[in-house]
Amino acid sequence: MDRTTIGPVAVVGIVGFGVIGQRWAAAFAHAGHTVHAYDPDPASEAAFQAASVQLTADLDALFPGVTPGPIRFFSDMGDALADVDFVQENGPEDIGLKRELLCEIERHVAADVVIASSSSALLVSDMQSACRFPARIVLGHPFNPVHLMPLVEIVGGAKTEPSALETARHLYETMGKKPVVMNREITGHLALRLMGAMWREAVALVRDGVASVEDVDRAFIYGPGPKWTLQGAFISNQLNASGMEDFLTKYGPTYQAIWDTLSDATLDAPTVAAVTASTAAAVGTRTQNQLKDERDAGLVAILQTIRQHGAL
């Protein structure tokens, strides 16, 4: 998660300056880029200013001794994007609105400027379908909280050029991010699908009364969580035997038996009620802000450890 010298991207345009866009802006600026931010909501600038001190402190803990680039705010998209080298789009998760927004961004930037969308689940092929220059549209999906989490998922659509993917990958890497370039599109991309599979089983376990939210979370935090954080699921499992083939041979039947009994989870009213009540019991008297502060402080320490000891 180290940084390298800034390449040809000097000015980054941020379109959509909500929570995701604000944290992208902080990360780009802290990596030395000039940031031009635009959002139709004038209150977004004040919201960022209120959060900026803590965002900068978080980034300083990960990357000390740097001088951040400037963040400039614009009330007009054309003015914001007039001379940018890269655009990070953070609009609503609606395919119709996303297409319109990408087409509008295109009107204000040169034909070779890569436009990366932060979309959580939409496919690039669908998003780029109405674009004039679809070859430069890519996915650049971050993980929350964006300014801290290293992962950025990159993938192109049917009309994306490989050079656009490489531009995005190089930019994110120079910021200290850990980009993964996917081989093809799929709904939910990579990490959310992995999380979704685990989350579905966790919800079912709570719904069916197998365990409480607190115990489900404890099982992960104090079980596979630390090992997976350092080495991922595959390498961690390989270490449980003399190699992956040996692991699959020895423990394959056990996992197959588990897979054969995994549950489906539908978020119907009874399930929502059960999960909500059990989560409230686990949270106790802590507020949302307290939980967020606990998370972000802990993430800094964890990410510093991964930088020193992580396998990948």
Predicted features along the sequence, with ranges:
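Internal alpha-helical scaffold of NAD(P)-dependent oxidoreductase catalytic cores
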Residues: A31, I154-E185, G196-P226
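Rossmann-fold dinucleotide-binding core
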Residues: S117-N183, G188
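Hydrophobic/aromatic residues located in beta-strands of well-ordered beta-sheets
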Residues: V35, V87, I115-A116, I137
